[in-house]
């Protein structure tokens, strides 16, 4: 769609580039017939995209700057960047920002697949929801927030879950479990089960990983092969679900009334809420 506007994906390598394209779309949306972003819905089916996945960016860059991988006291170093990308989303979308509290994930999918918007924040797992638009009409960009060195930034990549082996199980069961896990990622049958569309469609970080039938996965792999630095998921370091929920509530309040006072609520939820929830988790 942005090709119709005279842009290509190569025109966007930073937040400044993204902002330029997005605001041009908004300026010409009546002429073009579409908006820049799908609605940033903040109901329970959609808010995780912003209180968790989008919030990952300022956390990741703070960790990188400070040389850490976890903290009990986040500083909010990149909260201005978080505000900038959130402002861009909510002020250049398909609906008035005051309506976002009731907008859903399904609304965003519908807006994207019916070509009401150019950009839709989600991951490779959402391919099934948007495949009808056609693979040739799909691409992926990093989430740029104006952080230093982001021209070398790749896609956000990670996992929230892990396979664990119970140390209290019998030695035989532990070995059988390890053998099975090894079989899953090394054998032909196991990797087909793990990676193929007929199986679970996973991407596995092993040599036997199969080329995915999901084009979004292959785009993500291309970024890594070209030397772009993937953004780690920091979700497991977020102190609690309550922290996410409080942050989401503050983002929703701010979207409806974009004042500095309401952004202060976001800062408080992000920084003070982190310290509070981290302390509670250690009691």
Residue ranges and their predicted role:
Residues 1-2:
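Short, small-residue-biased leader/transition segments that mark boundaries at the very start
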Residues 5, 132-198:
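Extracytoplasmic/periplasmic substrate-recognition and gating elements
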Residues 13-17, 99-114:
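Short helix-initiation/N-cap motifs at beta->coil->alpha
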Residues 16-71, 117:
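Extracytoplasmic/periplasmic solute-binding protein
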Residues 21-23, 67-102:
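Glycine-centered hinge/linker elements that transmit conformational signals in sensory
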Residues 27, 225-283:
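Conserved C-terminal helix/tail region of periplasmic/extracytoplasmic solute-binding proteins
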Residues 32, 114-122, 136:
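Alpha-to-beta junction loops
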Residues 41-44, 59-84, 132, 145-155, ...:
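Short, solvent-exposed loop/beta-turn-alpha elements that line the ligand-binding surface or hinge
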């Amino acid at each position: 769609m942005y090709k119709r506007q005279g842009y290509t994906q190569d025109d966007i390598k930073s937040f400044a580039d993204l902002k330029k394209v997005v605001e041009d779309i908004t300026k010409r949306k009546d002429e073009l017939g579409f908006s820049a972003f799908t609605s940033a819905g903040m109901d329970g089916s959609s808010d995780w995209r912003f209180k968790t996945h989008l919030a990952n960016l300022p956390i990741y860059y703070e960790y990188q700057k400070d040389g850490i991988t976890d903290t009990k006291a986040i500083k909010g170093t990149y909260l201005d960047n978080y505000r900038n990308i959130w402002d861009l989303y909510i002020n250049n979308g398909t609906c008035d920002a005051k309506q976002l509290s009731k907008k859903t994930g399904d609304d965003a999918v519908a807006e994207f697949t019916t070509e009401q918007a150019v950009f839709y924040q989600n991951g490779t797992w959402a391919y099934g929801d948007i495949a009808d638009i056609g693979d040739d009409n799909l691409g992926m960009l990093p989430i740029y927030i104006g952080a230093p060195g982001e021209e070398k930034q790749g896609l956000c990549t990670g996992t929230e879950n892990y396979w664990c082996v119970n140390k209290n199980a019998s030695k035989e069961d532990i070995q059988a479990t390890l053998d099975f896990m090894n079989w899953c990622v090394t054998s032909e049958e196991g990797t087909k089960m793990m990676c193929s569309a007929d199986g679970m469609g996973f991407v596995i970080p092993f040599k036997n990983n199969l080329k995915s039938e999901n084009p979004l996965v292959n785009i993500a792999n291309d970024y890594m092969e070209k030397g772009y630095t993937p953004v780690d998921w920091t979700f497991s370091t977020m102190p609690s679900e309550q922290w996410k929920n409080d942050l989401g509530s503050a983002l929703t309040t701010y979207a409806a009334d974009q004042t500095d006072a309401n952004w202060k609520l976001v800062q408080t939820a992000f920084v003070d809420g982190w310290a509070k929830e981290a302390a509670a988790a250690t009691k």
